[in-house]
Design a protein with these regions (language model features):
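Alpha-helical interface subdomain recognition
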Residues: 1-71, 148-261
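Short, flexible active-site-proximal loops enriched in glycine and acidic residues
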Residues: 71-81
């Protein structure tokens, strides 16, 4: 049985990077461009894209993706893509491609892609394009691994949303006390954390991510929605990251929910 603690130092290294380099800059990175490229370059220096990473067990990789997505989900998505399909883009539907390139991965197939870049609701730091896909032939099937990483991203986004909401609630005062002192507010956060811990634990031992997908989508919806409620009117101000968590979670939901149909 895998002992994840054997990889504690590696997970901590990437977790510390996420906390110090991604979280404080997440709104800037969300705009893409140089901030996104700069973060990727630093990860390259840390060895995230070295061939040795391929030998790391999947549950450890899942933990690392969780850590990165707590900082900035688009960065986590890029790392996950690199660990699965390398330099290929990922076709998320028959027309929508994430990290577009001339060759894309499409449901276990290698495909040719031509399209135009588009702006999207969430995961804005990732480039996206709409266009035409032409299947060229079979390719190694990475659908299952990609889904594991997508759910890991939902976990990280949910954790970040709850953390931001809790920190805000402990500072924001109403009726001469912090709003964290109100039972309902604490209940939102505690319930969200129970969802997160349940999905996180199951994800690390599961052999089939599809069995967790519906619960993971519900978890992310609850955590990001309640975080928005806790921030109140401030949740709609771009200076706070809580709206980004909601957008990123909704974007992943729109990409993944069709798998449940």
């Amino acid at each position: 049985m895998l002992n994840i603690s054997e990889y504690r130092d590696l997970i901590s290294l990437f977790g510390e990077f996420s906390e110090k380099e991604l979280s404080p800059k997440r709104l800037e990175i969300d705009k893409g461009g140089e901030a996104f490229k700069g973060a990727i370059n630093k990860l390259e220096e840390l060895g995230v894209f070295d061939e040795e990473i391929n030998s790391i067990p999947l549950p450890v990789k899942i933990k690392i993706i969780m850590e990165f997505s707590r900082g900035e989900a688009g960065i986590a998505q890029f790392v996950a893509k690199s660990w699965t399909v390398g330099n290929l883009g990922i076709a998320r539907s028959e027309k929508l491609v994430q990290f577009p390139s001339e060759r894309v991965y499409y449901n276990g197939k290698l495909a040719e892609f031509k399209g135009e870049n588009v702006d999207v609701l969430g995961l804005r730091s990732c480039p996206w394009a709409l266009g035409e896909i032409r299947v060229l032939g079979d390719y190694g099937n990475f659908d299952k691994e990609i889904l594991f990483y997508d759910i890991a991203c939902l976990v990280g986004i949910s954790e970040a949303a709850l953390e931001s909401a809790e920190n805000y609630a402990k500072e924001r005062k109403a009726f001469d006390r912090t709003i964290y002192d109100f039972e309902e507010i604490r209940g939102f956060i505690q319930r969200g954390r129970s969802y997160v811990e349940g999905i996180k634990g199951a994800l690390l031992v599961s052999e089939d991510p599809m069995k967790l997908l519906n619960l993971a989508l519900e978890m992310a919806y609850f955590c990001t929605d309640k975080a928005m409620q806790i921030f109140g009117g401030y949740s709609f101000i771009n200076e706070y990251p809580v709206q980004k968590f909601l957008r990123d979670a909704r974007m992943l939901r729109s990409l993944l929910i069709r798998k449940l149909w």
